[in-house]
Regions:
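Aromatic "clamp/platform" in nucleotide-sugar-dependent glycosyltransferases that forms part
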Residues: 286
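Nucleotide-sugar donor phosphate/pyrophosphate-binding loop at the beta->alpha transition
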Residues: 118-120, 128-150, 185
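Conserved donor-binding/catalytic core segment of Leloir-type glycosyltransferases
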Residues: 194-221, 234
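Carbohydrate-associated surface elements
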Residues: 49, 160, 182
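Nucleotide-activated donor-binding/catalytic signature segment of Leloir-type glycosyltransferases, i.e.
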Residues: 246-265
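A charged, aromatic-enriched C-terminal amphipathic alpha-helix characteristic of glycosyltransferases
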Residues: 342-366
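Short hydrophobic beta-strand element within catalytic cores of glycosyltransferases
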Residues: 303-306
């Protein structure tokens, strides 16, 4: 990624959300954008301001960030017509659309096609808490298919995505490039085993949305406490479902055993320290590909319990995690958690991709 080779390449990355908001897509875009920029590629991140008040333009870690207003404010299904103008009036060599789940993606692809700018799309497959939107995924894919078929490249972060989207969109698998998420946490000292012995910490990591399944971990905790009375749960994330999670913990009489809060987006050292202090990471989302949290848990050698469907199940099939049905009863989830605490899965050595690998693969695709 030398500057001489890539000085002329101007990449516009379009994403519905970006820092200071926290989430898997936001983290992915930040990690690859900063690495591409440090190698000489001119990277601009175009995103939306869903609440108002964020700078319209700023520079973060050598990457120019541009924000356009979202309407209506505060809604996940917002429109952002300003995306069209930025694409139409810029001098971009390629437009990279990150995530296809909002109205931002078709706007960006349509605008790029109108200007005859090559565009690629990374799906970042995931679920949604809104039942109507979840049921409308099939219609969404049908409507987006012509735009996706015209893309210069389609990027999946997991084999699961290639199989699913190829089938649903009737696009040959050869059109997809597999570029997994990276994992790169700083090395931190292991937690004090003597101090924490008998006080197991269960971590559930991800944006606070219903489909992420944090409520399943909270519901299982009373049953875990029957066998491990000092167990605690850390729900690591932020989002609109926080109040409901707190109310559930209070209703079950375990509020003092449940911590809910995110680590600051840029503080990877603190994230590593909190994860290392955990005894098991539990990800019971309705739908995921390969979430960064899962890869980070694997990289730290932590026991990992995942939902058996979607890309999480793929991790279990590879021997990197144990799995359970996302709809299992609270008692069954508790049994699975206790099993991980008592007899954690022993993994074979595995080489995980880094963010440098991810950025280099994207540059090759461009």
């Amino acid at each position: 990624m030398s500057r001489a080779e890539n000085a002329a390449l101007r990449v516009l990355m379009v994403t519905p959300r970006y820092l200071p908001q926290i989430g898997g897509v936001e983290r992915h875009v930040h990690e690859v954008a900063t690495r591409l920029a440090s190698g000489g590629t001119e990277v601009t991140v175009l995103t939306t301001d869903r609440e108002g008040g964020l700078p319209a333009r700023e520079r973060l870690d050598s990457v120019e960030v541009r924000r356009v207003p979202a309407h209506p404010r505060g809604r996940d299904w917002h429109f952002a017509p300003g995306v069209v103008g930025v694409i139409a009036h810029g001098r971009w060599d390629i437009v990279h659309v990150q995530s296809y789940h909002t109205f931002v993606a078709p706007l960006a692809m349509t605008a790029a096609a109108a200007r005859r700018i090559p565009y690629v799309l990374t799906f970042h497959g995931g679920g949604h808490s809104d039942a109507l939107r979840h049921r409308g995924r099939g219609l969404q894919r049908t409507l987006l298919r012509p735009l996706l078929a015209r893309a210069a490249g389609l990027v999946a972060v997991a084999e699961f995505e290639i199989e699913e989207y190829s089938r649903e969109l009737r696009i040959p698998q050869e059109r997809f490039a597999l570029i997994p998420n990276g994992v790169e946490l700083p090395r931190v000292p292991a937690a004090n085993g003597d101090e924490d012995a008998g006080h197991p910490l269960i971590a559930s990591v991800g944006r606070l949305e219903r489909y992420k399944g944090h409520q399943r971990v909270i519901a299982a905790l009373p049953h875990v406490l029957a066998s491990a009375p000092s167990a605690r749960v850390w729900i690591a994330g932020s989002g609109p479902y926080e109040q409901q999670l707190r109310e559930l913990a209070a209703e079950l009489g375990i509020a003092e055993r449940v911590e809910i809060g995110a680590v600051a987006a840029g503080d990877r050292g603190e994230m590593a320290r909190r994860l290392v202090a955990s005894d098991v990471v539990v990800l019971l989302s309705d739908f995921e590909t390969h979430p960064i949290a899962a890869l980070e848990a694997i990289s730290l050698g932590l026991p990992l319990l995942v939902a058996s469907g979607s890309g999480l199940g793929e991790l279990a099939q590879r021997g990197l995690a144990r799995s359970i049905d996302a709809d299992a009863t609270a008692e069954r989830v508790a049994e699975a958690i206790l099993h991980e605490l008592r007899d954690p899965l022993v993994r074979s050595p595995v080489v995980l991709p880094t963010w440098d690998d991810c950025a280099a693969a994207l540059l090759d695709l461009y």
